[in-house]
Amino acid sequence: MQPETQSSALPAYRFSIAPMLDWTDRHCRYFLRLLSRQTQLYTEMVTTGAIIHGKGDYLAYSEEEHPVALQLGGSDPAQLAHCAKLAEARGYDEINLNVGCPSDRVQNGMFGACLMGNAQLVADCVKAMRDVVSIPVTVKTRIGIDDQDSYAFLCDFIDTVSGQGECEMFIIHARKAWLSGLSPKENREIPPLDYPRVYQLKRDFPHLTMSINGGIKSLEEAKEHLRHMDGVMVGREAYQNPGILAAVDREIFGADTTDADPVAVVRAMYPYIERELSQGAYLGHITRHMLGLFQGIPGARQWRRYLSENAHKAGADVAVLEQALKLVADKR
């Protein structure tokens, strides 16, 4: 399945960062890669329509991001297959189909969590992609939708998509999704987590590779889940408190390495930032992903405030970051 990382015998899917709309863009992924060399990264969801009809380059990424997966949103097998071929040609390591996002704009486009109600269509989509690419095609989904939340429903979905779609890897968000009445944010918080159900799913489908997602806030929790699952996917915590990634290579992958130093990570971003600024990017679009880096460290609040107040100003460059670092370094 997933290609193994160069410096570890353990596969990259053992620990991954969730695809998060408006968050895990290419700037964010470049930054996260500096914290962990081995974590599997995912793009934001990109719709097939955007790739096929959009004017921008929705498949852009930096070579340094590997291993990196493209998450696709769509429900037309032919369009998904076309986009999967494009992504493989660009060098992506995996294609992931979004069958978990419950937002209204996703449902209106007939993709995301609403697809859970049509397992055969999901199977057709996965099979169409698998037929045209050699990289893994995976599915990220929930444990149920609306009142279709029995364990039997979940098993039927997995059985159909793995059997007829030939999907070999699933990422399971351990909550069900309400397709109406809750916002995407509420759907990440209100439906209760049911980790034991996901563990049971892995036991009942031992031949499939499965990662668990939802509410995981520490590496200790991740290691507990790994007693039952093949992989762990962390979402909001990794974005809001990215410092937890500094120890992932050592603690999760068993690498003989020192943990990433956050100050060194900031300075390692400078060449990338300077290159992006020279191509028309705005500093604030990059530094917004770095605000939580020093969480729990004296000076963290001053770091966030200084970047928030200065990164958007005309002509802002790496000098803003260097000045912000002084507010943290002086307290270390």
From Swiss-Prot:
EC number: 1.3.1.-, 1.3.1.91
Gene Ontology molecular function, alphabetical: flavin adenine dinucleotide binding; FMN binding; tRNA binding; tRNA-dihydrouridine20 synthase activity; tRNA-dihydrouridine20a synthase activity
Recorded catalytic activity of this chain's protein: 5,6-dihydrouridine(20) in tRNA + NADP(+) = uridine(20) in tRNA + NADPH + H(+); 5,6-dihydrouridine(20) in tRNA + NAD(+) = uridine(20) in tRNA + NADH + H(+); 5,6-dihydrouridine(20a) in tRNA + NADP(+) = uridine(20a) in tRNA + NADPH + H(+); 5,6-dihydrouridine(20a) in tRNA + NAD(+) = uridine(20a) in tRNA + NADH + H(+)
A Pfam family this chain is assigned to: Dus
UniProt keyword terms in alphabetical order: Flavoprotein, FMN, NADP, Oxidoreductase, RNA-binding, tRNA processing, tRNA-binding
Top-level EC class: oxidoreductase
Binding site for FMN: 19-21, 71, 140, 173, 213-215, 235-236
Residues at the site labelled Interacts with tRNA: 98, 185, 188, 301, 304
Entries under InterPro entries matching the protein: Aldolase_TIM (IPR013785), DUS-like_FMN-bd (IPR035587), DUS_fam (IPR001269), DusA (IPR004653), tRNA_hU_synthase_CS (IPR018517)
Cofactor: FMN
Active site: 101 (proton donor)
Role according to the record: Catalyzes the synthesis of 5,6-dihydrouridine (D), a modified base found in the D-loop of most tRNAs, via the reduction of the C5-C6 double bond in target uridines. Specifically modifies U20 and U20a in tRNAs.
Family: Belongs to the Dus family. DusA subfamily.
Protein name per UniProt: tRNA-dihydrouridine(20/20a) synthase
Gene for this chain: dusA
